């Protein structure tokens, strides 16, 4: 969605698109080595499907949410470099045959893909249902269509709490703290002392990104 702003007639690289609080120049600073798949234009296209993301609350809260999302994306993708999960040995483990819909794309088809590394057959089913795309039968769309890839990450961020007690979106807009976003995304593996180095990686990137956007990181950064 584009918004006409009379005081911002120029959509140059320093101007946020629409009402997104991160400009393309800032995005490129965050992801200097990114794969072209993770484009700013694909992200801003995906945002139209999630109108509450980084638009809720004060300017500081909006920037904190954008920074938190992009910091987690940076961690999950190695700085926007990796589109698919690098450990191929894990690929067959993401099929939960206990689900009534099974794994129609194959047992090894539901590996991590995209900005937040969507994995498991049930997550592909739920994301696809929400986005109106059959990701259960065609999970490869998440590694081939960059807008769909960004949408799956935003879907997870705004609707899924994982092992946590709230979604990452709720954690940021209600100022519960960045640590809750880590728990929602990968709490089983990283939180409660399981992998402090991974947690620190996410926190450090979040602190860098909030500084870049000119806001404070807030409290409760760890999980």
Locate each region found by the language model:
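Extracellular fibronectin type III
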Residues: 11-16
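Alpha-helical tetratricopeptide repeat
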Residues: 44-48
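Extracellular low-complexity, Gly/Ser/Thr-rich intrinsically disordered linkers
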Residues: 136, 141-210
């Amino acid at each position: 969605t584009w918004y006409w702003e009379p005081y911002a007639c120029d959509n140059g690289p320093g101007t946020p698109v629409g009402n997104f609080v991160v400009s393309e120049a800032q995005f490129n600073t965050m992801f200097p080595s990114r794969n072209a798949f993770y484009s700013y234009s694909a992200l801003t296209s995906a945002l139209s499907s999630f109108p509450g993301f980084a638009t809720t609350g004060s300017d500081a809260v909006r920037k904190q949410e954008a920074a938190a999302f992009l910091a987690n994306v940076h961690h999950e993708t190695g700085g926007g470099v990796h589109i698919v999960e690098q450990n191929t040995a894990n690929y067959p483990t993401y099929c939960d045959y206990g689900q009534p819909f099974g794994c129609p794309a194959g047992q090894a088809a539901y590996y991590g893909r995209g900005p937040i590394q969507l994995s498991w057959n049930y997550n592909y089913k739920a994301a696809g249902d929400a986005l109106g795309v059959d990701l259960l039968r065609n999970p490869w769309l998440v590694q081939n269509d960059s807008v769909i890839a960004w949408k799956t990450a935003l879907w997870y961020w705004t609707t899924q709490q994982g092992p946590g007690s709230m979604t990452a979106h709720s954690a940021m807009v209600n100022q519960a703290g960045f640590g809750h976003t880590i728990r929602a995304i990968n709490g089983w593996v990283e939180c409660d002392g399981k992998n402090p180095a991974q947690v620190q990686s996410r926190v450090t990137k979040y602190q860098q990104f909030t500084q870049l956007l000119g806001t404070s990181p807030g409290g409760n950064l760890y999980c």
